């Protein structure tokens, strides 16, 4: 019997410390074949982790999972503008990295950190590979912002 194949789409992945690392390990322990599409590690400080740069590496193996990394603008300095650029760049580069993936997926999991537009590459992958997409949403942004700040502007609330 052929192993089930799953694609995990997430901006943040090992060596960054996120729960998705454990989830991928669980999939592997259950006998699934796992590919991960992710960015280059630079969270939370905004600096590339040792061994990484804007030039890669683009392919790795994490405990048996095939890791495909794509470009992103780092959060360098964690200023509002850099974080915004990071939020916009990763889904765009990830979307245009789908051609590098082998396909044949039975399912796609989007580990969706904020903002919600991070799910765009996973939805595009679902369409391209004709596979169902599930999204694990960790932060409903900017809705969580409105829960702590008194934003009353109807236009801003409508955009959210």
Predicted segments, located by residue:
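Structural motif
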Residues: 5, 106-107
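A conserved catalytic-core segment of Leloir-type glycosyltransferases
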Residues: 38-98, 102
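Short, well-ordered alpha-helices that flank and scaffold nucleotide-derived cofactor binding pockets
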Residues: 25, 29, 96, 100, ...
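An aromatic- and histidine-rich active-site surface loop
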Residues: 17, 84-95, 107-129, 135-144
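Acceptor-binding helix/loop patch of EC 2.4 sugar-transfer enzymes
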Residues: 11, 74-82, 129-160
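Short, glycine/charged-enriched secondary-structure capping and boundary segments
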Residues: 21-24, 49-52, 83, 122-126, ...
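N-terminal subdomain of nucleotide-sugar transferases
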Residues: 1-61
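Surface-exposed, flexible loop/turn segments at secondary-structure boundaries
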Residues: 14, 42-44, 75, 116, ...
């Amino acid at each position: 019997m052929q192993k089930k194949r799953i694609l995990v789409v997430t901006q943040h992945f090992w060596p960054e410390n996120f729960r998705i690392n454990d989830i991928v390990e669980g999939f592997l322990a259950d006998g699934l074949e796992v590919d991960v599409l992710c960015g280059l590690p630079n969270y939370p400080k905004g600096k590339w982790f040792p061994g990484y740069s804007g030039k890669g590496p683009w392919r790795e193996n994490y405990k048996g999972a095939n890791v495909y990394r794509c470009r992103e603008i780092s959060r360098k300095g964690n200023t509002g503008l850099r974080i915004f650029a990071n939020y916009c760049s990763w889904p765009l580069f990830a979307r245009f990295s789908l051609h590098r993936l082998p396909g044949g997926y039975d399912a796609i999991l989007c580990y969706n950190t904020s903002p919600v537009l991070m799910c765009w590459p996973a939805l595009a992958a679902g369409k391209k590979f004709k596979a169902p997409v599930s999204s694990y949403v960790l932060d409903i942004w900017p809705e969580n912002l409105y829960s702590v700040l008194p934003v009353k502007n109807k236009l801003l609330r409508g955009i959210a």
